[in-house]
Each structure stands twice: as structure tokens, then as C-alpha cells.
Amino acid sequence: MPKILNALLCKFPYLELFTNLTKMRYTKVKSILSLFFVLLLPVFLRAQSNNSSSGSNLNKLQQQFVDLRFGMFIHFNMPTYWNADWPDPEASPALFNPKKLNADQWAKAAKSANMTYGCLTTKHHSGFCIWDTKSTDYSVMNSPYKKDVVKQFADAFRANGLKVMLYYSILDTHHKIRPNQIEPEDIEMIKTQLTELLTKYGKIEALIIDGWDAPWSRISYDDVSFQDIYNLIKKLQPECLVMDLNGAKYPGDGLYYTDIKTYEMGAGQRMAKDVKRMPTLACLPINSAWFWKEDFPTVPVREPQKIVNELIKPLNEASCNFILNVAPNRDGLIDDNALASLKEVGKLWKNEGPTTKLSPLEDPIIASNIAINAPANSSWSDDMNIMDFANDDDYHSSWQSNPRVKEPWFEIDFKKDRSFNTIVVFESKANISKYKLQYWDGAAWKQIFSGDNAERVKLHRFDRVWGSKVRIQIEGSKENPSIAEFQVFDERR
């Protein structure tokens, strides 16, 4: 009984009632403890079960995803009818009318290239939904076409032995889901739409999310809680991988807010060769843009030889799944030049099955970083790289210790007690090798970690603690120590 009650207190630190129990008579204490045990045990066990089911199973799903090697991205939505990837958000649904749409043609084109899956843009940044949604009138059901495109896609790809993935944009300019003006009803719309997509179309292998915590969308993981959305997806489909297209911001050797690292190669994003290998997705269009343009039928597409030798093969060797975008035209069909290129790719490249086995990975960070812009202190800093650079949410700036300091330290001061259970120390390059992590409990510094860790991304997960300060004391480094981001999280586990 005491062990379980202690665990409950760690899991639910807000139960301050227990602090007063010692003042009561033994029989009353025993009665109250028994009542709490009965009421909270199912919640505790469920939380423990959810936590224990993630780690090794997620690693298995990550490996399976990388082993798929090659798939088809299908950008097909309102931009198809505008000759622009970002159309007018007030564009009329009357424009969307793919009279000859044939999802079976898409699937067979993917098969001809030896692809293993497809991923369709269910909603892009302008907010038009191409499934039968109850969340808005701005959908395919109010267009002249009036048919559920997502259903046709899912049915056709499964019928051809291909796996099904979906793309969804958090940024929604039609419904004004934009930075600095997101209301609770906007978040409910997002949850409703994701629930529809994950309950109406069978097993979804992965969900690619876009327009979230990107420099151009500026919707943060606090504006729309990543942890809430991630947990909703896992509740609806526990084996659905969550991929946020955030590779431009976060370090390549850490899983931040995604189950799979992602890189949009057309935006200049590339995997670093000198960091720890991660399960990865890279994407690029076969044409010059993501959505169909009027010149696509007559402009040459990517050469099959280059697709195979410069993209599929080297990316697969780096534990990276490559997804090639092939945009259907306004009739809902893939153009002949793209079909021919895909068929040639299939002649040049065969899927040889599993890739190199990945090393086991920690679960991704999904909670908000409570250290961002909190008051920071440190030992003597380099004049141009002060302590505030280590928690500014900018991975390209760093706090740097003054070289004269023999025992450098860095500290976050929350000014009040906060609960947390995860700390990440990120360096621009691996340098710090030995250190201590401690927190202030109001009376003394308590130790979280003391030892060696030469990784560039130093991830520490531990039982939840309460403290008003947290610090690192650096005891060993190859050169003058610096920290790009000192991060603190309170994860739900």
C-alpha cells in the first residue's frame, strides 16, 4: 500500500490533502487512504499502461516506417484550381470539380514505381476539406463534385496493397486558425476534424501535420497544445505515427514534437551527416511545385535516374523514407509525363525490404518547454553570448561561459515552485561531457543527475519533482562550454 500511495502522489502532486493526514487518528487516516486508493487506482493503472506501451512499440513502428522506403505524396486540394500553392482563403467551393477523378489510377501509378504507400492532403493551409466533414461547410460536399475524396483514396490504395497515410494542416486561413487569434472553438474544430479522419477511413499508418510551429505559420505548440493533439491521435489510433513538418527548427539528433524526423528538401532542409541517426522522412515534388500547375503537362518532370540514384537510394541508406509528391490535375488524374516517369522509376529500382536496423530511441518530447524566456542566471558569461541565449527557443544562439571560469554553471529561476520531470540540454556541438543537474526545493539543492554524457542532445527523464530553480553544474568539457537550449518539461506520463 505505501508504495502505491507514493506513486499516486508522484503522479498526482496536487493532492495536498495527504499532507494533513498525519494530524488525524490512525483509523480515520486508514479509511481515507483506502478510499483514495480505490478511486484513483484505475486512473493510475491506465496512466502506467499508456506509458509502458509506448517506448519499444514506437521503436518498432519507426523501423517499419523506414522499411517502407518509398511512397507517394498527393497534393490535391483547392490550390489545384488556382495555379498557386496558397490560394485565396475565400475561394468558392464551386471551383473544386475533378470530374474524372480516379484514385485507382493514383494507386496503380504508385505501384508502378514500387512505392509502398500514399499520403493525401486532406486539408491544406487554405482550409478546404476534401472529406465528408461535419465540422464546416467549406468542404468537398458543398462543391459540384460532392464526393468524399479521402474515402476514394483510402479504398483505392488499400485495394492495390498500399498503406494509407494522411496530411493535415493546423494553419487554416479560411477558418482564421492563425497565430495570436486562436480560440477554444478553433481547437475543438481541429480535434473534431482529426477524429473524423482517424475514425472513418480505417487504419492510418501515419499522419503528417503541417503549418505548426513553423517560421512561416507562427502557430506555436502553446497556441495549439501539441501534447493534447498527440495524445488524441494516439488514443484514436495507437499505432498511427505522428509527423510534424518541423525539421527546419529542431536539431536533427533529437525527436522533438514528432515520431519521425522530417525534412522538406525543396525548402533546403537536409539531414546532417555528423549527428545521431534518426528515423526520417524526406519529401520533394516530381514537378516544380507541390500542387498542380497549368504548365505541368508540358514541362519535364524529375528524371527517373536522378530520383533513384540521388534520392531513394542514398536516403534509404541513411534510414530515411522518401516520399515523392505527384500532383493530380484538375480532372483528378495524374498527367502522362508523371506516369511515364514513375513507371521508369519502377524499372530502375526495386524495394529490397528492411533497411538497416535503427538503434533504440527515447519517446519524443511532446510537452511545452516551461523554461522558454524564464529568468536565467549563470557564472561569468562571454560578453557576446550571455545566459539569456540558452533559453530563448533559438537553436542557433548559445550561452557561452567565460573561459576564465573553472566551474561554470547555468540556472533557470521560475520564481515559484513548478513541477517538471524532463530536462534537455542541447549543445550546438557535442562538448560538455560531465555535469550535475539539480533543482531547488525551497531549502536545498537536490540532485537529479550526476555523471558523464557526451551526447549533443542530453535528455533526462525522471520522477516528477517540484522546484523553483533548476541548474547545471559543468564539471568536464573538451573546450569552453556553451549551451544552445536548456529545456524543462512537465510531461504527462
Regions picked out by a protein language model, each given a short descriptive name:
Residues 477-483:
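Extracellular carbohydrate recognition
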Residues 24, 442-447:
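Asp-box/BNR beta-propeller loop motif
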